Amino acid sequence: MPELPEVETVRRTLAGLVRGKTIDAVDVRWTKIIKRPEEPEEFARLLAGQTIQSIGRRGKFLLFHLDDCVMVSHLRMEGKYGLHQNDEPLDKHVHVIFRFTDGSELRYRDVRKFGTMHLFKPGEELTELPLRQLGPEPFSSEFTADYLRERLKKTNRSVKTALLDQRTVVGLGNIYVDEALFRAGIHPEATANKLTKKQTVLLHKEIIQTLKEAVEAGGSTVRSYINSQGEIGMFQLKLFVYGRKDEPCKKCGSPIEKTVVGGRGTHFCIKCQKK
């Protein structure tokens, strides 16, 4: 699933492609993707004639800001946006098509069909699900070391499980939780409320630094991720532990181990991240 760096990269590339374009019509081919309004026909009707003013991001969600509404889109496992001309062949996995007045069209492709789209009035998107319960952005002034420490003190779950909870901080998924924990020298199964202040301060720093570096590298392509211009990310070349089971640790040489934490495959170094 795309995490913050991948979604931010998609946002940046997509904004350059479609900002200022006006929607002529919307073709919904897989209706279950549309979550709000309930009727896909109403979704299409409300978007017709709307111009894309900007594209924002909240956690792993893309926010399309139009004249009179905001579309909140989650890519889930395999969702991708691409700009095409209307005479280009149509892929069978394209499930929503936004046709623009200039003859181009934005196609939403999703092999797994897990993606979602919600339509709101401006401002309403922040007070309703799915955005309402999200925690702070990791690059925001709200996400401080003190905030993280107080949040983790309230749970006896593993620190990995706590960080994957989007109510703690948004944008982190399997890849970047594993990487941040490795950089901070914290075992993924460590109990969240047992971390010391020193550990939490370092973890806070490494979360921000890891995400910053990943955004600068265009995200990580470990399976099928590409941005809206068809380009892969490059941060996978800098990963310390994720996807490196049995390979030598880049710091100590010990083989990277893989276990399951909170139902998620988890990579770590048993020497650098002692329990």
Swiss-Prot record:
Cofactor annotation remark: Binds 1 zinc ion per subunit.
Lineage, broadest ranks: Bacteria, Bacillati, Bacillota, Bacilli, Bacillales
Needed cofactors: Zn(2+)
NCBIfam families: fpg, PRK01103.1
Keyword Protein biosynthesis: no
Residue numbers annotated as active site: P2 (schiff-base intermediate with dna), E3 (proton donor), K60 (proton donor), R264 (proton donor)
Organism: Bacillus licheniformis (strain ATCC 14580 / DSM 13 / JCM 2505 / CCUG 7422 / NBRC 12200 / NCIMB 9375 / NCTC 10341 / NRRL NRS-1264 / Gibson 46)
Entry GO MF terms: 8-oxo-7,8-dihydroguanine DNA N-glycosylase activity; class I DNA-(apurinic or apyrimidinic site) endonuclease activity; damaged DNA binding; zinc ion binding
Start-end of FPG-type zinc fingers: 240-274
Protein name: Formamidopyrimidine-DNA glycosylase
